């Protein structure tokens, strides 16, 4: 499960988790915990500021740990916007470890996401414009399709309507029940 920051992943995934037998594992949180143990970062938002090599090493460690788990939904990012450009959130060596069967990409209007980010004092977010958010959502779509080609996993695009996360969650639950 993926989507840009502020799209509502955590809210939707909380509903999905309650309605299924799946546990939710946050890939970024696992990477953060590993990076913090190494004294590389103090907060989660610093992860994307690390060198690309460091991020790749953390991705490998986290994917190895998650790959050993069963019946999990991974809360992650298809593309990570870094100072040097977009970094694949699920490069080949990661998806191989994870054994992905479905990709869900949660989306919303860039204006709505921009407004949500402004209201969230709990995170240190980049000051992206609506256009940059839209670009990031497009890049996420490209990456999702590329990952699907490599894994054979299906891709599902889910719209998170403001104030109605149950609708998005129920679409995901229905797809998971088909598996």
PLM regions: where:
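Post-Walker A helix-loop "phosphate-sensing" segment adjacent to the P-loop in P-loop NTPases
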Residues: 18-25
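NTP-dependent small-molecule kinase module
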Residues: 141-179
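Hydrophobic positions on the alpha1 helix immediately C-terminal to the Walker A/P-loop
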Residues: 12
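ATP-dependent small-molecule kinase phosphotransfer cores
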Residues: 27-88
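P-loop (Walker A) phosphate-binding loop of NTP-binding proteins
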Residues: 4
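ATP-dependent NMP and nucleoside kinases share a basic, alpha-helical "lid"
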Residues: 76-120
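Conserved glycine(s) of the Walker
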Residues: 8
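Hydrophobic anchor at the beta1->P-loop junction of P-loop NTPases
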Residues: 1
């Amino acid at each position: 499960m993926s989507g840009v920051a502020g799209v509502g992943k955590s809210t939707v995934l909380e509903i999905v988790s309650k309605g299924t037998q799946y546990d939710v594992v946050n890939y970024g949180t696992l990477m953060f915990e590993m990076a913090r143990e190494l004294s590389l970062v103090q907060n989660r938002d610093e992860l994307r500021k690390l060198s690309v090599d460091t991020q790749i090493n953390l991705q490998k460690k986290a994917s190895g740990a998650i790959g050993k788990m069963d019946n999990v939904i991974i809360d992650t990012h298809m593309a990570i916007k870094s100072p040097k450009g977009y970094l694949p959130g699920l490069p080949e060596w990661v998806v191989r470890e994870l054994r992905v069967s479905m990709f869900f990409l949660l989306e919303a209007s860039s204006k709505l996401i921009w407004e949500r980010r402004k209201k969230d004092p709990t995170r240190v977010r980049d000051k992206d414009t609506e256009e940059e958010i839209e670009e990031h959502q497009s890049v996420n779509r490209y990456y999702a399709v590329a990952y699907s080609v490599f894994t054979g996993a299906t891709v599902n695009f889910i719209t998170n309507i403001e104030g109605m996360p149950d609708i998005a969650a129920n679409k995901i639950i229905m797809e998971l029940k088909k598996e």
